[in-house]
Amino acid sequence: MREAICIHIGQAGCQVGNACWELFCLEHGIQPDGAMPSDKTIGVEDDAFNTFFSETGAGKHVPRAVFLDLEPTVVDEVRTGTYRQLFHPEQLISGKEDAANNYARGHYTIGKEIVDLCLDRIRKLADNCTGLQGFLVYHAVGGGTGSGLGALLLERLSVDYGKKSKLGYTVYPSPQVSTAVVEPYNSVLSTHSLLEHTDVAAMLDNEAIYDLTRRNLDIERPTYTNLNRLIGQVVSSLTASLRFDGALNVDLTEFQTNLVPYPRIHFVLTSYAPVISAEKAYHEQLSVSEISNAVFEPASMMTKCDPRHGKYMACCLMYRGDVVPKDVNAAVATIKTKRTIQFVDWSPTGFKCGINYQPPTVVPGGDLAKVQRAVCMIANSTAIAEVFARIDHKFDLMYSKRAFVHWYVGEGMEEGEFSEAREDLAALEKDYEEVGAESADMDGEEDVEEY
């Protein structure tokens, strides 16, 4: 078996986790108490869901997941919520006092006390696996726990499980909507560590997903639940090949191989289609070519950045439902002819496609329509540098006055870490610039050397 362990860190990670596990259970016909009704004969022919669930002797299915937060309220919601019987109590770990939006508290003072316990639980889950593929880490980098403890945990996982791939679903601060003043500090410090210790990081941003739900689902004031359910669909599409059978299955490590041209350039854009409400879906065709075009629209991106401003380096399209390879090839051929979708000149093919026959499942009473087919795109584009540029700019404004820095230094951080992290991100922006640069001018220089 190729198992994957999910790690949900901090408030964002745990709440996204709730939405994801709700969806995974629905997709596999697992009830909130972990039982799988006997009339569901799915389990007989298809046990691929064991990548995400482990089966106990009593026939209960337990998610291979850990929820951790430095303060109890969010994890308590899981402990008392609909799915309280699904998780093993030891998998829900909470501390007493929170990180207070402070990276240093999450990484040094408070996080340090809880991290060994977390690793111990993760070790237990890993021992239950026959062939662990890797970890899916869900967190946000704007707060204290997700950024600080998230970075600390990833560093420790790199040491303990060096060769296993680590995929991050990372919520980055939005351009306009902010939940904390010190977001830029936390993000820069955390990204400094993510550069080293994650293999692929899918960037999400609340504002982009707000706009998407508001525009496409006609929800005037989307709540976090609406957003998380949409993120859940994306995560589900990306991991569908691990959990179901299909024509073209895609493995965790395959993402890495196909999306990451250079180790540092591993921050990817995601988008999903069709995001459509039930009233509209009734009147639309939603053919393969339509949904394939939709995922390339700047408006469907889950991060506020315009892919038209950059070039694509690689792109995975994960189809699910009633889709045949012939349609996919036709759709991809059309996309390649479009002028708006530009690839870097050193990546001529650039597309990886996956097809999964399981149609997308929707949460009953949710906002998304039940559709026959859906596609999720995960792409590596140089446009994502916009996100870093934006955060770096805000960081510089605050750091030039050393505002709020004493809170971090007081928790045992050194001021040098700020400048070190900031320099690392400046180098990252430079890397993106160079990758997107025309390689034609480089040929000219090489000719000079030869003659």
Swiss-Prot record:
Question: What GO biological process term is on the record, naming one?
Answer: microtubule-based process
Reaction(s) the record says it catalyses: GTP + H2O = GDP + phosphate + H(+)
Q: Which InterPro entries match?
A: Alpha_tubulin, Tub_FtsZ_C, Tubulin, Tubulin/FtsZ-like_C, Tubulin/FtsZ_2-layer-sand-dom, Tubulin/FtsZ_GTPase_sf, Tubulin_C, Tubulin_CS
Enzyme category, top tier: hydrolase
What keywords appear on the UniProt entry?
A: Acetylation, Cytoplasm, Cytoskeleton, GTP-binding, Hydrolase, Magnesium, Metal-binding, Microtubule, Nucleotide-binding
Question: What residues does Mg(2+) bind to?
Answer: 71
EC number in record: 3.6.5.-
| Gene Ontology MF terms in the entry | GTP binding; hydrolase activity; metal ion binding; structural constituent of cytoskeleton
Q: Which cofactors does it use?
A: Mg(2+)
> What are the GO cellular component annotations?
cytoplasm; microtubule
- Where does this one sit in the cell? Cytoplasm, Cytoskeleton
As stated in the Swiss-Prot or TrEMBL entry, residues carrying the post-translational modification N6-acetyllysine are 40
Where does the record place the site Involved in polymerization? Answer: 451
Processing after translation: Undergoes a tyrosination/detyrosination cycle, the cyclic removal and re-addition of a C-terminal tyrosine residue by the enzymes tubulin tyrosine carboxypeptidase (TTCP) and tubulin tyrosine ligase (TTL), respectively. Acetylation of alpha chains at Lys-40 stabilizes microtubules and affects affinity and processivity of microtubule motors. This modification has a role in multiple cellular functions, ranging from cell motility, cell cycle progression or cell differentiation to intracellular trafficking and signaling.
Functionally, this protein is described as follows: Tubulin is the major constituent of microtubules, a cylinder consisting of laterally associated linear protofilaments composed of alpha- and beta-tubulin heterodimers. Microtubules grow by the addition of GTP-tubulin dimers to the microtubule end, where a stabilizing cap forms. Below the cap, tubulin dimers are in GDP-bound state, owing to GTPase activity of alpha-tubulin.
Assembly description: Dimer of alpha and beta chains. A typical microtubule is a hollow water-filled tube with an outer diameter of 25 nm and an inner diameter of 15 nM. Alpha-beta heterodimers associate head-to-tail to form protofilaments running lengthwise along the microtubule wall with the beta-tubulin subunit facing the microtubule plus end conferring a structural polarity. Microtubules usually have 13 protofilaments but different protofilament numbers can be found in some organisms and specialized cells.
Q: Which family does it belong to?
A: Belongs to the tubulin family.
Read off the PANTHER family from this record. Answer: TUBULIN
Q: Report the protein name in the record.
A: Tubulin alpha chain
